[in-house]
């Protein structure tokens, strides 16, 4: 029964739970809490029901991955602050000049989150293609670090080179700043993208 749940229902349950938490809990720590909670749930499931027994990671590997996850979380927060400080002013001016500040704030948050998700994933798709197509972009972004793991698990799935965080955060930042997206919709989208990637 647990195996069937994991196979067919875990991913939708995770996404619904994360979006529900975002909608129902008003806390600045919701992102951090859901990421940690999801890592605990998936890490426990990997231990209890590993997809392959050979993939069970030694404790030292899990600890080092956990340290890297925390470091990258801090680094990604700093990238977000840097983008806010350096890009918000110029992109707001461009948005005003081109009349792009028309975001539908009155629409349901879930609809807004999926709109941002689709638009940012479209941009990210082309960035990701460029990373794989051109050696220069591959090296500049450090994308190879993401592909260096031989066994993926809940902790190392999204470990990227710190430089790649600039590329990862760029699509949502551009959309948010150009179209006047509200903080709640942008935050819900970041949670959605993160949890979809983990699960």
Predicted segments with their positions:
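Hydrophobic alpha-helical transmembrane segments of polytopic
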Residues: 10, 31, 35-39, 187
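Hydrophobic, membrane-inserted alpha-helices
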Residues: 13-20, 168-174
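Membrane-helix interface linkers and caps
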Residues: 38-65, 84-101
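A well-structured
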Residues: 30-31, 95
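Alpha-helical transmembrane segments and their membrane-interface exit regions
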Residues: 36-46, 191-199
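Membrane-embedded catalytic scaffold of the fatty acid hydroxylase/desaturase
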Residues: 67-199
């Amino acid at each position: 029964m647990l195996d069937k749940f994991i196979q067919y229902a875990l991913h939708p349950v995770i996404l619904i739970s994360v979006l529900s938490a975002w909608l129902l809990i008003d806390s600045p720590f919701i992102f951090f809490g859901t990421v940690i909670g999801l890592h605990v749930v998936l890490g426990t499931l990997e231990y209890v029901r590993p997809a392959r027994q050979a993939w069970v990671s030694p404790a030292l590997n899990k600890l080092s991955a956990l340290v890297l996850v925390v470091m990258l979380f801090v680094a990604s927060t700093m990238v977000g602050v840097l983008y806010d400080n350096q890009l918000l002013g110029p992109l707001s001016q461009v948005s005003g000049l081109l009349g792009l500040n028309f975001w539908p704030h009155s629409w349901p948050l879930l609809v807004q989150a999926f709109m941002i998700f689709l638009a940012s994933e479209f941009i990210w798709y082309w960035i990701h293609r460029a990373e794989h197509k051109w050696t220069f972009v591959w090296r500049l972004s450090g994308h190879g670090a993401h592909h260096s793991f031989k066994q993926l698990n809940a902790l190392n799935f999204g470990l990227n080179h710190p430089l790649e965080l600039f590329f990862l955060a760029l699509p949502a930042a551009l959309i948010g700043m150009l179209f006047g997206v509200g903080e709640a919709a942008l935050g819900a989208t970041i949670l959605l993208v993160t949890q979809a990637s983990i699960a």
